[in-house]
A protein has these predicted regions:
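Gram-positive cell-envelope targeting signals
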Residues: 1-33
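Acidic, contiguous N-terminal accessory segments
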Residues: 24-130, 176-185
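Conserved radical SAM core fold
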Residues: 259, 299-301, 365-380, 411-413
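Structured mid-domain segments that build the active-site/substrate or prosthetic-cofactor binding neighborhood
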Residues: 265-269, 279, 381-487, 494
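Acidic, His- and aromatic-enriched active-site or binding-groove loops in soluble protein domains
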Residues: 312-329, 357-376, 433, 463-470
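Substrate-binding cleft/loops of secretory-pathway carbohydrate-active enzymes
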Residues: 340-371, 417-425, 450-458
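Catalytic domains of carbohydrate-active enzymes that cleave complex glycans
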Residues: 437, 464-604
Length: 604
């Protein structure tokens, strides 16, 4: 009987083991979880889960520990060393730290540099990089320091899940493990030159570098609107004929509220400008290519002398034709130079009967002289007559030149704090520019003070300039979730969406608030925005970091309400007091590009 019992128990145990083995063998491996819920909200917990899911790759962090070090080829470049310190900071946050060493060496490492690596396909653009993940090594490879800094910050964003919120705040997901799949990732930016004119990025170059839009990365542009300054004042004073002929006279000062221009058909003016750019090239202190600029002043005036008028007529009516001819002449005389000129205001349309030299770059601006531009939708939508005309311009310019640089605009320059809902337009416009072969883009945000949605916009613009095909909804929602917290973010996302949906074309960079009093800035809609913002404040649970960012959002809404006079005299007085207090908290004193509207004046 005992023998039978033992045999029975043995059979039962064998069956259980077999069943367990079969279950384990048939069990499917866990799959990555979605990073966004059905409402588009970013799910940090799923990122953390997915970070530990891979089995066969580089076990960078396991259970809050790392066996890796950071190795880099010796360099004295401060930007690379700063980026390495930022990467070290990531490991300090998630696993207590990591060793940083120079040169080659054994053991698991994140290697920053060439380290004998030969790419199968050469990198094309200056800031490009490769990230290769192996079992024991992660290589961040580039041909130059610009690519290395891009590679380090790109690795932190795209692999480690970081977000650079501002110059001093980096979001780091609180992972316990980070396992990366083996891969080779070649990263080429969409544009050779990428610049974002933004208050935060401009004041803190390290932040600009984190966003991979450092101005010194590729070719440099020589600004614009300074041709008058290229000719010595004492010479200009002796030669009135060097100035533009307007309404029957040479105008040496302001005329009709606009500044003076040169007469670009004057041969002596051309010679003086030639001398100036030759000297600039001779005396430059950088090894980088500089496109020296000869352009109109920031004025709507242009020369109407007999010679200039004839050139304008020959070009089909483009009032910048004398400037284009001037630049072409100098470019032909000096093929060793790179010259640029604006296609701006009255010169934005492609001219007829002009062929540009190979060493001339056109700097086209999404800013016309023939009416109100529209930033409520991409140019491809053709939401307004002017949008259709501008679309035709960017389709036409690549037929005349291989070198195009574009100035884009992403804020309201008359009213920095007024919500400016251009997020729907930005991706489509950037893709269009990429598809037309544009070499560089300058996205100009609120650059000399803070503006509405500025932290999101500088991030969004920078990433679009690197990859115009990114999922814009996911990018925006992830940023807002991290920036305002997962509990408050749904209300801010809804508020931003409502503002966009309520906006009627045209949306212009020089709009006054009353232009939109019947659409997105109506009193009824403003009440909806305040309600959503109040819900966000209530939802964030008293977290002061999030509350401060929500106060900034409220300040922007208050600006619109005060400007439009929404409320009784007592209510407006209360709003002005609150607005003034918030401006002081965020160190805001001026409310527009020129600084002519101060907080004190606005709140009187």
């Amino acid at each position: 009987m005992k023998t039978i019992t033992k045999i029975s128990l043995t059979l039962v145990l064998a069956a259980l083991l077999c069943l367990t083995f079969c279950c384990c063998a048939n069990k499917e491996p866990e799959k990555p979880r979605p990073l966004f819920d059905e409402d588009g909200l970013y799910l940090e917990e799923n990122f953390i889960f997915n970070a530990a899911l891979e089995k066969d790759g580089a076990h960078l962090v396991e259970n809050e520990k790392t066996e890796y070090c950071i190795r880099y080829e010796e360099t004295t470049d401060e930007s690379v060393l700063t980026a390495i310190e930022e990467l070290r900071g990531y490991f300090s946050a998630v696993c207590g730290g990591i060793e940083v060493k120079t040169g080659a060496g054994e053991g698991k490492a994140i290697r920053v540099g060439k380290y004998g690596y030969v790419p199968s396909t050469p990198l094309v653009k200056t800031g490009a990089y490769i990230i290769e993940v192996g079992e024991n090594d992660i290589l961040i490879y580039a041909e130059n320091v610009f690519g290395l800094t891009n590679g380090i910050y790109g690795f932190m964003e795209d692999y480690l899940g970081c977000i650079f919120l501002d110059h001093e705040t980096t979001y780091i997901p609180p992972v316990k493990s980070m396992i990366l799949a083996k891969s080779t990732d070649v990263q080429e930016p969409a544009f050779e030159s990428r610049t974002v004119g933004d208050n935060e990025a401009g004041n803190y170059k390290s932040f600009e570098q984190k966003l991979r839009v450092r101005e010194d990365e590729t070719f440099l542009t020589d600004g614009c609107h300074h041709s008058l300054n290229m000719i010595p004042k004492d010479i200009l004073a002796q030669h009135k004929e060097y100035y533009a002929f307007i309404d029957g006279a040479r105008r040496t000062g302001n005329y009709l509220g606009q500044g003076p221009q040169l007469c670009f058909s004057n041969e002596e003016v051309i010679n003086l400008l030639e001398e100036a750019v030759v000297n600039k090239e001779k005396n430059k202190t950088t090894d980088q290519t500089v496109w020296w600029d000869i352009s109109q002043q920031d004025s709507m005036n242009y020369c109407e002398c007999e010679k200039c008028s004839a050139l304008i007529a020959e070009s089909g009516g483009n009032a910048a034709a004398p400037i284009f001819r001037c630049v072409n002449i100098i470019a032909k005389r000096h093929p060793e130079l790179k010259l640029s000129t604006l296609a701006y205001h009255y010169g934005s349309s492609p001219p007829e009967n002009i062929e540009f030299e190979d060493n001339v770059m056109i700097k086209w601006c999404i800013m016309s002289s023939y009416g109100t531009n529209d930033y409520s939708a991409p140019l491809t939508d053709g939401a307004t007559k002017i949008a259709k005309q501008q679309y035709a311009e960017i389709m036409g310019w690549p037929e005349l030149t291989d070198h195009i640089f574009v100035w884009d605009y992403i804020t309201n320059y008359f009213n920095y704090l007024l919500p400016f809902p251009c997020l729907d337009a930005m991706p489509g416009n950037i893709r269009l520019l990429r598809d037309r072969g544009v070499e560089g883009v300058f996205s100009l945000n609120a650059f000399n003070n803070r503006g509405s949605w500025d932290r999101l916009k500088v991030n969004f613009a920078s990433h679009l300039l690197w990859n115009p095909d990114l999922n814009e909804t996911e990018f925006i929602n992830r940023f807002l979730t991290v920036y305002f917290g997962k509990d408050a973010a749904p209300y801010i996302i809804r508020m931003y969406r409502k503002i966009h949906d309520n906006t009627c074309a045209p949306l212009w960079v020089y709009d006054f608030s009353f232009y939109h009093k019947i659409d997105y800035l109506s009193e009824m809609q403003m009440d909806v925005y305040y309600g959503l913002l109040d819900s966000a404040v209530e939802a964030c649970g008293g977290d002061e970091t999030y509350l401060k960012r929500l106060r900034y959002e409220r300040m922007c809404l208050l600006y619109a309400s005060i400007d439009l006079g929404y409320g009784t005299e007592e209510e407006l007085a209360s709003m002005k007091e609150e607005f003034s207090r918030l401006c002081a908290e965020f160190s805001i004193t001026k409310l527009n590009e020129l600084g002519t509207n101060t907080v004190v004046e606005f709140c009187r």
